Swiss-Prot record:
Entry's EC annotation: 3.6.1.9
One Pfam short name: Maf
Subcellular location: Cytoplasm
Catalytic activity: dTTP + H2O = dTMP + diphosphate + H(+); UTP + H2O = UMP + diphosphate + H(+)
MF (Gene Ontology): dTTP diphosphatase activity; UTP diphosphatase activity
Protein name: dTTP/UTP pyrophosphatase
Cofactor section: a divalent metal cation
Site description Important for substrate specificity, residues in chain: R13, T72, Q154
GO cellular component, one term: cytoplasm
Cystines in this chain: none
UniProt entry keywords in alphabetical sequence: Cytoplasm, Hydrolase, Nucleotide metabolism
Amino acid sequence: MTNAVYLASASPRRKELLTQLGIEFTQFSVDADESQLPNELPYDYVERLARLKAQSGVALGYTDRPVLGSDTVVVIDNQSLGKPCDENDFTHTLKRLSGNTHQVLTAVAFATTDKVLSCVVSTNVTFKTLSDDEIHTYWQSGEPQDKAGGYGIQGLGGRFVTHISGSYFAVVGLPLYETEQLLQTFLRG
């Protein structure tokens, strides 16, 4: 095996971050049920999804090198916050994040036909107190619609962040250090 991988994700952010690692990859998307199971903890949920995405890539026939699956979830009060379904959902989410610290969990998994290895990276992010106008203006920008928790730290949403403790890149969607370390461990066997 070489350091080349498959990236089982349509995310342009994950593509960009994996490129930064200098790892050769081919990108494709998988169709996976991303529903959270009843009573499933956010940590278990995000890790299960990353593993599911990687294993789904293997099931599609991508078997000559490791398949990388990843998922990110924003958590506040031990509740997972998904991508906003509409402006009302988004407004409710950002009001919960406003003036508070939340966790961003990003899971990374590598899979082949005979093994799966995964890890979860947790980062604490603190938001300033947001006005209704800031929340509405941010929604109108179009940026929050496809983001877990309704914001992108690497874009306009970054201006709401007063403090971060952990991996910035995990919040964006792929923790660089941990991804590289996990791949090295995976390839060593």
